[in-house]
């Protein structure tokens, strides 16, 4: 299978799972909150889910198996904290340290979670939160989250080879072209 076909298959799998979670819970609320730069929480978690599945497939070709369903749901719910952490609300202080526990609490309100899904959500901020993941799936999401956050923050500020100013310009992944234009002045 070509890389393009594999990526399309993963994208469809993530979209389907996200629609299911949106119907059963409040995942669509994450479209309203910005995570990194001008990327919404929804766009971020779907990117993390795609990266996690891609990495899991590479591991699978090396003979290392994962619980794909828990990996996907955990990736989509890892930032299910359901608030705008940019608001000056005192409860949002130390968001980086505390949001995994808020996300886990909200996810447990809306969904029945497996132990692996709980581990993914609670431990994805390692090493900032100093308790490491204890399963492969949580390690995968932890690493995919770091990679996607890097791309969303740093890479969005770097000049592109094609001369465009914004990594997310014209994106359909939940990032806002309008807010990109506001940032540029």
Report each predicted region and the residues it spans.
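Metal-dependent phosphohydrolase cores
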Residues: 1-185
């Amino acid at each position: 299978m070509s890389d393009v076909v594999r990526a399309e298959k993963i994208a469809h799998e993530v979209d389907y799972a996200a629609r299911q979670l949106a119907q059963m819970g409040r995942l669509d609320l994450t479209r309203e909150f910005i995570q990194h730069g001008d990327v919404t929480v929804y766009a971020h978690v779907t990117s993390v889910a795609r990266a996690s599945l891609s990495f899991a497939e590479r591991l699978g070709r090396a003979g290392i198996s994962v619980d794909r369903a828990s990996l996907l749901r955990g990736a989509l719910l890892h930032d299910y904290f359901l608030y705008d952490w940019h608001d000056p609300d005192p409860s949002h202080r130390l968001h980086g340290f505390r949001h995994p526990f808020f996300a886990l609490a909200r996810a447990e309100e809306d969904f029945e979670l497996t132990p692996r899904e709980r581990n993914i959500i609670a431990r994805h901020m390692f090493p900032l939160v100093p308790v490491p993941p204890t399963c492969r799936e949580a390690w995968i999401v932890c690493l995919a989250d770091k990679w996607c956050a890097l791309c969303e923050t740093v890479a969005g500020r770097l000049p592109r080879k094609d001369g465009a100013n914004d990594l997310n310009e014209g994106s359909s992944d939940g990032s806002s072209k309008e807010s990109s234009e506001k940032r540029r002045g």
